[in-house]
Protein backbone atom coordinates (compact mmCIF):
# COMPACT_ATOMS: atom_id res chain seq x y z
CA UNK A 1 0.00 0.00 0.00
CA UNK A 2 1.25 3.47 -0.89
CA UNK A 3 1.98 5.91 1.88
CA UNK A 4 -0.47 8.81 2.29
CA UNK A 5 0.73 12.14 3.66
CA UNK A 6 -1.03 13.57 6.69
CA UNK A 7 -1.20 16.86 4.80
CA UNK A 8 -3.28 15.18 2.09
CA UNK A 9 -5.68 13.78 4.68
CA UNK A 10 -6.27 17.24 6.16
CA UNK A 11 -6.55 19.01 2.82
CA UNK A 12 -9.01 16.49 1.33
CA UNK A 13 -10.69 14.72 4.25
CA UNK A 14 -13.91 13.97 2.35
CA UNK A 15 -11.98 12.09 -0.33
CA UNK A 16 -10.30 9.79 2.19
CA UNK A 17 -13.20 9.31 4.64
CA UNK A 18 -14.06 5.62 4.89
CA UNK A 19 -10.93 4.53 3.02
CA UNK A 20 -8.08 2.44 4.34
CA UNK A 21 -4.78 4.32 4.19
CA UNK A 22 -1.18 3.91 5.27
CA UNK A 23 0.61 6.68 7.15
CA UNK A 24 4.12 6.76 8.58
CA UNK A 25 5.47 9.13 11.18
CA UNK A 26 6.72 9.80 14.68
CA UNK A 27 4.76 9.53 17.91
CA UNK A 28 4.24 12.98 19.42
CA UNK A 29 1.98 11.72 22.20
CA UNK A 30 0.50 8.41 23.35
CA UNK A 31 -2.30 7.66 25.80
CA UNK A 32 -3.62 4.21 26.56
CA UNK A 33 -5.96 2.26 28.81
CA UNK A 34 -6.44 -1.48 29.13
CA UNK A 35 -8.67 -1.74 26.08
CA UNK A 36 -7.62 1.03 23.68
CA UNK A 37 -5.18 3.88 23.10
CA UNK A 38 -4.56 7.08 21.15
CA UNK A 39 -1.44 8.11 19.26
CA UNK A 40 -0.73 11.62 17.99
CA UNK A 41 1.27 10.87 14.86
CA UNK A 42 3.18 13.52 12.92
CA UNK A 43 4.79 12.70 9.59
CA UNK A 44 6.44 16.09 8.98
CA UNK A 45 4.22 16.96 6.01
CA UNK A 46 1.79 19.08 8.03
CA UNK A 47 1.80 21.18 11.16
CA UNK A 48 -1.00 19.20 12.78
CA UNK A 49 -0.74 15.57 13.84
CA UNK A 50 -3.24 12.83 13.05
CA UNK A 51 -4.94 10.89 15.83
CA UNK A 52 -4.54 7.12 15.59
CA UNK A 53 -7.01 5.02 17.58
CA UNK A 54 -5.86 1.47 18.38
CA UNK A 55 -7.34 -1.30 20.50
CA UNK A 56 -6.81 -4.89 21.64
CA UNK A 57 -7.69 -6.23 18.20
CA UNK A 58 -4.07 -5.46 17.31
CA UNK A 59 -1.79 -8.46 17.85
CA UNK A 60 0.90 -6.15 19.23
CA UNK A 61 -1.42 -3.93 21.30
CA UNK A 62 0.65 -4.17 24.50
CA UNK A 63 3.89 -3.41 22.65
CA UNK A 64 2.38 -0.39 20.90
CA UNK A 65 0.88 0.92 24.14
CA UNK A 66 4.34 1.07 25.71
CA UNK A 67 6.14 2.81 22.85
CA UNK A 68 8.32 5.77 23.92
CA UNK A 69 7.69 9.22 22.43
CA UNK A 70 9.36 9.87 19.05
CA UNK A 71 9.31 6.21 18.06
CA UNK A 72 8.57 5.89 14.34
CA UNK A 73 5.72 3.69 13.15
CA UNK A 74 3.83 2.71 10.02
CA UNK A 75 0.05 2.55 10.42
CA UNK A 76 -2.64 1.03 8.25
CA UNK A 77 -6.21 1.89 9.12
CA UNK A 78 -9.54 3.36 8.13
CA UNK A 79 -10.11 7.12 8.00
CA UNK A 80 -13.11 7.98 10.18
CA UNK A 81 -14.67 11.45 9.86
CA UNK A 82 -15.20 13.12 13.25
CA UNK A 83 -16.76 16.50 12.41
CA UNK A 84 -17.86 17.19 15.98
CA UNK A 85 -14.47 16.49 17.54
CA UNK A 86 -11.35 18.62 17.95
CA UNK A 87 -9.90 17.08 14.79
CA UNK A 88 -11.93 16.54 11.57
CA UNK A 89 -10.98 12.86 11.32
CA UNK A 90 -9.04 10.05 12.97
CA UNK A 91 -7.60 6.76 11.81
CA UNK A 92 -8.82 3.48 13.31
CA UNK A 93 -5.67 1.36 13.21
CA UNK A 94 -5.85 -2.12 11.69
CA UNK A 95 -2.10 -2.67 11.73
CA UNK A 96 0.84 -0.84 13.32
CA UNK A 97 4.44 -1.71 12.46
CA UNK A 98 7.32 -0.30 14.48
CA UNK A 99 9.91 1.32 12.21
CA UNK A 100 12.30 2.60 14.87
CA UNK A 101 12.21 2.65 18.65
CA UNK A 102 13.11 5.78 20.58
CA UNK A 103 15.07 5.51 23.82
CA UNK A 104 13.19 6.29 27.02
CA UNK A 105 15.56 9.20 27.73
CA UNK A 106 14.17 11.18 24.77
CA UNK A 107 14.48 14.79 26.01
CA UNK A 108 11.24 16.16 24.54
CA UNK A 109 8.72 14.77 26.99
CA UNK A 110 5.13 15.94 27.65
CA UNK A 111 5.92 19.35 29.08
CA UNK A 112 6.77 22.82 27.86
CA UNK A 113 10.44 23.47 27.29
CA UNK A 114 12.07 26.90 27.21
CA UNK A 115 13.54 28.14 23.95
CA UNK A 116 16.87 28.46 25.76
CA UNK A 117 16.86 24.75 26.56
CA UNK A 118 15.75 23.82 23.05
CA UNK A 119 18.76 25.66 21.60
CA UNK A 120 20.96 23.11 23.38
CA UNK A 121 19.23 20.33 21.43
CA UNK A 122 18.92 22.12 18.09
CA UNK A 123 19.05 18.77 16.29
CA UNK A 124 15.77 17.74 17.98
CA UNK A 125 13.89 21.03 18.31
CA UNK A 126 12.22 20.89 14.86
CA UNK A 127 10.10 18.11 16.39
CA UNK A 128 8.35 20.64 18.64
CA UNK A 129 5.31 22.63 17.53
CA UNK A 130 7.04 26.01 17.77
CA UNK A 131 10.02 25.04 15.66
CA UNK A 132 8.06 22.88 13.26
CA UNK A 133 6.02 26.00 12.53
CA UNK A 134 9.06 28.27 12.39
CA UNK A 135 11.07 26.28 9.91
CA UNK A 136 8.15 25.44 7.66
CA UNK A 137 7.39 29.17 7.49
CA UNK A 138 11.07 29.80 6.77
CA UNK A 139 10.85 27.44 3.79
CA UNK A 140 7.60 28.94 2.52
CA UNK A 141 8.85 32.52 2.91
CA UNK A 142 12.07 31.71 1.03
CA UNK A 143 10.07 30.21 -1.82
CA UNK A 144 7.78 33.25 -1.90
CA UNK A 145 10.74 35.60 -2.26
CA UNK A 146 12.26 33.52 -5.06
CA UNK A 147 8.89 33.37 -6.81
CA UNK A 148 8.38 37.13 -6.49
CA UNK A 149 11.63 37.87 -8.31
CA UNK A 150 11.32 35.06 -10.85
CA UNK A 151 7.83 36.20 -11.86
CA UNK A 152 9.30 39.63 -12.58
CA UNK A 153 12.14 38.36 -14.75
CA UNK A 154 14.97 38.79 -12.25
CA UNK A 155 18.07 36.65 -12.71
CA UNK A 156 19.17 34.76 -9.58
CA UNK A 157 22.92 35.23 -9.09
CA UNK A 158 25.05 32.99 -6.88
CA UNK A 159 27.63 35.33 -5.38
CA UNK A 160 30.88 34.09 -3.77
CA UNK A 161 31.12 33.10 -0.12
CA UNK A 162 34.86 33.79 -0.08
CA UNK A 163 35.78 37.36 -0.96
CA UNK A 164 38.72 39.73 -1.04
CA UNK A 165 36.71 42.89 -0.38
CA UNK A 166 34.61 44.29 2.46
CA UNK A 167 31.25 45.50 1.14
CA UNK A 168 30.33 47.43 4.26
CA UNK A 169 33.82 48.74 5.01
CA UNK A 170 33.26 47.73 8.62
CA UNK A 171 36.16 45.32 8.96
CA UNK A 172 34.16 42.83 11.05
CA UNK A 173 34.92 39.84 8.84
CA UNK A 174 35.91 36.21 9.29
CA UNK A 175 39.34 35.48 7.86
CA UNK A 176 39.82 32.52 5.54
CA UNK A 177 43.28 30.96 5.62
CA UNK A 178 45.11 27.67 5.15
CA UNK A 179 48.24 28.99 6.86
CA UNK A 180 49.87 26.92 9.60
CA UNK A 181 48.83 29.03 12.57
CA UNK A 182 51.81 27.75 14.55
CA UNK A 183 54.21 28.91 11.86
CA UNK A 184 52.69 31.83 9.98
CA UNK A 185 54.97 33.18 7.21
CA UNK A 186 55.95 36.80 7.73
CA UNK A 187 57.59 39.42 5.57
CA UNK A 188 60.59 41.62 6.39
CA UNK A 189 58.28 44.09 8.12
CA UNK A 190 57.12 41.39 10.54
CA UNK A 191 53.60 41.35 9.10
CA UNK A 192 51.84 38.20 7.88
CA UNK A 193 52.86 37.44 4.28
CA UNK A 194 49.44 37.09 2.65
CA UNK A 195 51.03 36.15 -0.68
CA UNK A 196 51.92 32.75 0.79
CA UNK A 197 48.28 31.98 1.62
CA UNK A 198 45.95 29.85 -0.51
CA UNK A 199 44.54 32.75 -2.56
CA UNK A 200 47.71 34.83 -2.53
CA UNK A 201 45.99 37.65 -0.67
CA UNK A 202 43.85 38.28 2.39
CA UNK A 203 40.43 36.69 1.99
CA UNK A 204 37.33 36.60 4.16
CA UNK A 205 33.83 35.23 4.36
CA UNK A 206 31.42 37.58 2.63
CA UNK A 207 29.39 40.16 4.53
CA UNK A 208 27.20 40.83 1.49
CA UNK A 209 26.73 39.74 -2.10
CA UNK A 210 25.86 43.27 -3.19
CA UNK A 211 29.01 44.32 -5.04
CA UNK A 212 29.01 41.13 -7.10
CA UNK A 213 25.29 41.52 -7.75
CA UNK A 214 25.91 45.02 -9.09
CA UNK A 215 28.24 43.56 -11.71
CA UNK A 216 25.48 41.26 -12.93
CA UNK A 217 22.80 43.96 -12.78
CA UNK A 218 24.89 45.93 -15.26
CA UNK A 219 24.56 43.00 -17.67
CA UNK A 220 21.15 41.46 -16.89
CA UNK A 221 19.41 44.62 -15.65
CA UNK A 222 17.40 43.00 -12.82
CA UNK A 223 19.10 40.46 -10.54
CA UNK A 224 18.95 39.20 -6.97
CA UNK A 225 20.99 37.15 -4.57
CA UNK A 226 19.73 35.04 -1.69
CA UNK A 227 22.49 33.50 0.34
CA UNK A 228 24.47 33.26 3.57
CA UNK A 229 26.52 36.16 4.88
CA UNK A 230 28.89 36.38 7.81
CA UNK A 231 29.75 39.05 10.38
CA UNK A 232 32.47 38.64 13.01
CA UNK A 233 30.61 41.02 15.28
CA UNK A 234 30.96 39.98 18.92
CA UNK A 235 27.37 40.88 19.80
CA UNK A 236 25.42 38.60 22.11
CA UNK A 237 22.02 40.10 21.39
CA UNK A 238 18.69 38.69 20.28
CA UNK A 239 19.12 40.32 16.86
CA UNK A 240 22.67 39.38 15.87
CA UNK A 241 24.15 36.17 14.51
CA UNK A 242 27.53 35.45 12.95
CA UNK A 243 25.91 33.63 10.03
CA UNK A 244 22.63 34.72 8.47
CA UNK A 245 20.91 34.96 5.10
CA UNK A 246 20.43 38.05 2.98
CA UNK A 247 18.08 38.86 0.11
CA UNK A 248 19.77 41.45 -2.12
CA UNK A 249 18.21 42.59 -5.41
CA UNK A 250 19.91 45.05 -7.76
CA UNK A 251 18.13 46.87 -10.56
CA UNK A 252 19.80 48.86 -13.34
CA UNK A 253 18.48 52.13 -14.81
CA UNK A 254 16.89 52.78 -11.44
CA UNK A 255 16.85 55.43 -8.74
CA UNK A 256 16.00 55.39 -5.03
CA UNK A 257 12.25 55.65 -5.60
CA UNK A 258 12.31 52.56 -7.80
CA UNK A 259 13.97 50.45 -5.14
CA UNK A 260 11.51 51.65 -2.49
CA UNK A 261 8.64 50.55 -4.73
CA UNK A 262 10.30 47.16 -5.23
CA UNK A 263 10.83 46.79 -1.48
CA UNK A 264 7.18 47.49 -0.71
CA UNK A 265 5.93 45.13 -3.41
CA UNK A 266 8.22 42.27 -2.33
CA UNK A 267 7.36 42.58 1.34
CA UNK A 268 3.62 42.55 0.72
CA UNK A 269 3.90 39.65 -1.71
CA UNK A 270 5.92 37.50 0.68
CA UNK A 271 3.62 38.19 3.62
CA UNK A 272 0.48 37.42 1.61
CA UNK A 273 2.05 34.19 0.37
CA UNK A 274 2.95 33.03 3.88
CA UNK A 275 -0.54 33.80 5.20
CA UNK A 276 -2.08 31.86 2.33
CA UNK A 277 0.25 28.84 2.42
CA UNK A 278 0.92 28.47 6.16
CA UNK A 279 -2.43 29.27 7.83
CA UNK A 280 -2.06 26.68 10.60
CA UNK A 281 1.45 27.82 11.47
CA UNK A 282 0.50 31.49 11.47
CA UNK A 283 -2.50 30.81 13.69
CA UNK A 284 -0.17 28.99 16.08
CA UNK A 285 2.20 31.97 16.25
CA UNK A 286 -0.68 34.36 16.78
CA UNK A 287 -2.11 32.21 19.59
CA UNK A 288 1.00 31.08 21.44
CA UNK A 289 3.98 33.30 20.51
CA UNK A 290 2.81 36.85 19.72
CA UNK A 291 -0.87 37.76 19.64
CA UNK A 292 -0.18 40.76 17.37
CA UNK A 293 1.43 38.84 14.49
CA UNK A 294 -1.59 38.62 12.19
CA UNK A 295 -2.68 42.19 12.92
CA UNK A 296 0.85 43.42 12.23
CA UNK A 297 1.15 41.55 8.94
CA UNK A 298 -2.24 42.72 7.72
CA UNK A 299 -1.28 46.29 8.63
CA UNK A 300 1.78 45.99 6.38
CA UNK A 301 -0.14 44.33 3.55
CA UNK A 302 -2.96 46.88 3.57
CA UNK A 303 -0.92 50.06 4.13
CA UNK A 304 0.65 52.45 1.68
CA UNK A 305 4.14 52.85 3.12
CA UNK A 306 5.01 56.32 4.33
CA UNK A 307 8.04 58.32 3.17
CA UNK A 308 10.02 60.94 5.05
CA UNK A 309 13.55 62.29 4.75
CA UNK A 310 16.05 61.77 7.54
CA UNK A 311 16.19 65.54 8.13
CA UNK A 312 12.40 65.74 8.42
CA UNK A 313 12.39 62.69 10.73
CA UNK A 314 14.93 64.31 13.06
CA UNK A 315 12.74 67.40 13.26
CA UNK A 316 9.62 65.32 13.99
CA UNK A 317 11.41 63.40 16.75
CA UNK A 318 12.80 66.57 18.32
CA UNK A 319 9.37 68.20 18.35
CA UNK A 320 7.56 65.09 19.61
CA UNK A 321 8.23 65.72 23.29
CA UNK A 322 8.98 62.01 23.74
CA UNK A 323 11.50 61.02 26.41
CA UNK A 324 14.14 59.14 24.40
CA UNK A 325 17.06 57.35 26.01
CA UNK A 326 19.31 58.45 23.14
CA UNK A 327 19.33 62.19 22.30
CA UNK A 328 18.12 63.16 18.84
CA UNK A 329 20.26 65.43 16.71
CA UNK A 330 21.12 65.67 13.04
CA UNK A 331 23.98 63.33 12.15
CA UNK A 332 23.16 60.49 14.55
CA UNK A 333 22.27 56.99 13.40
CA UNK A 334 18.65 56.48 14.42
CA UNK A 335 18.27 54.07 17.33
CA UNK A 336 15.56 51.41 17.55
CA UNK A 337 13.50 53.59 19.91
CA UNK A 338 13.52 56.40 17.32
CA UNK A 339 12.65 54.05 14.47
CA UNK A 340 9.77 52.48 16.36
CA UNK A 341 8.42 55.88 17.44
CA UNK A 342 8.31 57.01 13.82
CA UNK A 343 6.59 53.85 12.55
CA UNK A 344 4.31 53.21 15.53
CA UNK A 345 3.38 56.66 16.85
CA UNK A 346 3.82 59.04 13.93
CA UNK A 347 2.94 56.99 10.83
CA UNK A 348 1.29 53.92 12.45
CA UNK A 349 2.45 51.92 9.43
CA UNK A 350 5.71 51.09 7.63
CA UNK A 351 7.71 54.14 6.61
CA UNK A 352 10.76 54.75 4.44
CA UNK A 353 13.30 57.19 5.88
CA UNK A 354 15.51 58.55 3.10
CA UNK A 355 18.57 60.70 2.48
CA UNK A 356 20.75 59.91 5.47
CA UNK A 357 23.97 61.77 6.35
CA UNK A 358 26.81 60.31 4.29
CA UNK A 359 29.00 59.86 7.37
CA UNK A 360 26.77 57.13 8.81
CA UNK A 361 26.26 55.21 5.56
CA UNK A 362 28.37 52.98 3.30
CA UNK A 363 30.84 54.19 0.67
CA UNK A 364 28.87 52.92 -2.34
CA UNK A 365 25.75 55.03 -1.73
CA UNK A 366 25.10 57.87 -4.17
CA UNK A 367 26.06 61.31 -2.88
CA UNK A 368 23.17 63.77 -3.07
CA UNK A 369 23.55 67.24 -4.54
CA UNK A 370 23.80 68.80 -1.07
CA UNK A 371 27.13 67.00 -0.54
CA UNK A 372 26.04 66.00 2.96
CA UNK A 373 23.52 63.21 2.45
CA UNK A 374 23.29 60.06 0.35
CA UNK A 375 20.42 58.46 -1.58
CA UNK A 376 19.82 55.79 1.04
CA UNK A 377 16.69 54.48 2.68
CA UNK A 378 15.75 52.35 5.66
CA UNK A 379 12.31 50.79 5.90
CA UNK A 380 10.99 51.07 9.45
CA UNK A 381 8.11 48.85 10.54
CA UNK A 382 5.96 48.84 13.69
CA UNK A 383 7.12 46.43 16.34
CA UNK A 384 10.74 46.14 15.28
CA UNK A 385 12.16 49.29 13.69
CA UNK A 386 14.50 48.88 10.72
CA UNK A 387 13.68 45.88 8.55
CA UNK A 388 15.29 46.67 5.19
CA UNK A 389 18.08 48.98 4.06
CA UNK A 390 18.61 50.12 0.49
CA UNK A 391 20.20 52.80 -1.64
CA UNK A 392 20.89 54.14 -5.05
CA UNK A 393 24.48 53.19 -5.83
CA UNK A 394 27.12 55.74 -6.75
CA UNK A 395 27.55 55.44 -10.53
CA UNK A 396 29.98 58.38 -10.95
CA UNK A 397 33.55 57.10 -11.00
CA UNK A 398 35.21 60.26 -9.64
CA UNK A 399 32.76 60.64 -6.76
CA UNK A 400 33.10 56.97 -5.82
CA UNK A 401 36.91 57.11 -5.86
CA UNK A 402 36.86 60.23 -3.68
CA UNK A 403 34.57 58.48 -1.21
CA UNK A 404 36.79 55.40 -1.01
CA UNK A 405 39.82 57.60 -0.35
CA UNK A 406 37.92 59.70 2.18
CA UNK A 407 37.17 56.57 4.21
CA UNK A 408 40.77 55.37 4.07
CA UNK A 409 39.86 52.24 2.12
CA UNK A 410 42.23 50.51 -0.29
CA UNK A 411 41.25 51.59 -3.79
CA UNK A 412 43.08 48.63 -5.35
CA UNK A 413 40.76 46.17 -3.59
CA UNK A 414 37.85 47.63 -5.55
CA UNK A 415 39.46 47.90 -9.00
CA UNK A 416 36.86 45.67 -10.64
CA UNK A 417 33.99 47.46 -8.89
CA UNK A 418 35.27 50.79 -10.19
CA UNK A 419 35.55 49.36 -13.71
CA UNK A 420 31.79 48.82 -13.71
CA UNK A 421 31.54 52.63 -13.83
CA UNK A 422 34.20 52.82 -16.53
CA UNK A 423 32.47 50.58 -19.06
CA UNK A 424 28.92 51.81 -19.56
CA UNK A 425 27.95 52.49 -15.98
CA UNK A 426 24.43 53.65 -15.28
CA UNK A 427 22.21 54.57 -12.39
CA UNK A 428 21.29 51.50 -10.38
CA UNK A 429 19.90 50.70 -6.96
CA UNK A 430 19.20 47.84 -4.59
CA UNK A 431 18.34 46.79 -1.07
CA UNK A 432 19.26 44.19 1.51
CA UNK A 433 16.78 42.24 3.61
CA UNK A 434 18.07 40.22 6.53
CA UNK A 435 15.96 37.12 6.02
CA UNK A 436 16.03 36.12 9.69
CA UNK A 437 14.90 39.57 10.77
CA UNK A 438 11.98 39.24 8.38
CA UNK A 439 11.15 35.82 9.86
CA UNK A 440 11.26 37.24 13.39
CA UNK A 441 8.82 39.92 12.30
CA UNK A 442 6.25 37.57 10.77
CA UNK A 443 6.47 34.82 13.41
CA UNK A 444 6.88 36.88 16.57
CA UNK A 445 9.91 34.80 17.55
CA UNK A 446 11.97 37.18 19.69
CA UNK A 447 15.46 35.73 19.19
CA UNK A 448 17.33 35.32 15.91
CA UNK A 449 18.72 32.04 17.26
CA UNK A 450 15.21 30.62 17.02
CA UNK A 451 14.64 31.27 13.31
CA UNK A 452 17.93 29.73 12.10
CA UNK A 453 18.13 25.91 12.11
CA UNK A 454 21.62 25.79 13.61
CA UNK A 455 22.56 29.29 14.82
CA UNK A 456 26.15 30.53 14.81
CA UNK A 457 26.78 33.11 17.52
CA UNK A 458 29.81 34.19 19.61
CA UNK A 459 31.07 31.15 21.50
CA UNK A 460 28.57 28.81 19.86
CA UNK A 461 29.19 26.61 16.83
CA UNK A 462 27.60 23.34 17.93
CA UNK A 463 25.93 21.00 15.48
Curated annotation (Swiss-Prot):
UniProt-listed Pfam families: tRNA-synt_2, tRNA_anti-codon
GO MF assignments: asparagine-tRNA ligase activity; ATP binding; catalytic activity, acting on a protein; nucleic acid binding; transferase activity
Keyword Cytoplasm included in the entry's annotation: yes
Listed InterPro entries: Aa-tRNA-synt_II, aa-tRNA-synth_II, aa-tRNA-synth_II/BPL/LPL, Asn-tRNA-ligase, Asp/Asn-tRNA-synth_IIb, NA-bd_OB-fold, NA-bd_OB_tRNA
Enzymatic reactions: tRNA(Asn) + L-asparagine + ATP = L-asparaginyl-tRNA(Asn) + AMP + diphosphate + H(+)
Entry-linked SUPFAM superfamilies: Class II aaRS and biotin synthetases, Nucleic acid-binding proteins
GO biological process, one term: asparaginyl-tRNA aminoacylation
Localization per Swiss-Prot or TrEMBL: Cytoplasm
Keywords from the UniProt entry: Aminoacyl-tRNA synthetase, ATP-binding, Cytoplasm, Ligase, Nucleotide-binding, Protein biosynthesis
Ribosomal protein among keywords: no
GO cellular component: cytoplasm
Root EC class: ligase
EC number: 6.1.1.22
CDD domains given in the database record: AsxRS_core, EcAsnRS_like_N
Assembly information from the UniProt record: Homodimer.
Family: Belongs to the class-II aminoacyl-tRNA synthetase family.
HAMAP family recorded: Asn_tRNA_synth (MF_00534)
Listed name of the protein: Asparagine--tRNA ligase
Source lineage: Bacteria, Bacillati, Bacillota, Bacilli, Bacillales
Amino acid sequence: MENTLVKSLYRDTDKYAGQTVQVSGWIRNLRDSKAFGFIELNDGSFFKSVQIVFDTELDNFKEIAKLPLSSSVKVEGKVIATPGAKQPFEIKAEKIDIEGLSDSDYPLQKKRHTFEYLRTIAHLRPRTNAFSATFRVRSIAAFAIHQFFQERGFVHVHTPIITGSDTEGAGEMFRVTTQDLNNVPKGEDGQVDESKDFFGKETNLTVSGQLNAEAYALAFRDVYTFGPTFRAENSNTTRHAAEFWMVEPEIAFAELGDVMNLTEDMLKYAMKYVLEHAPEEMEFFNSFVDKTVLERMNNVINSDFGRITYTEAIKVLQESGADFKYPVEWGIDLQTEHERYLSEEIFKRPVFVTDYPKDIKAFYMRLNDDGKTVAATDLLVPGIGELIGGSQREERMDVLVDRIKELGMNEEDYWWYLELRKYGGTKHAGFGLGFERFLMYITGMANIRDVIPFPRTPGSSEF
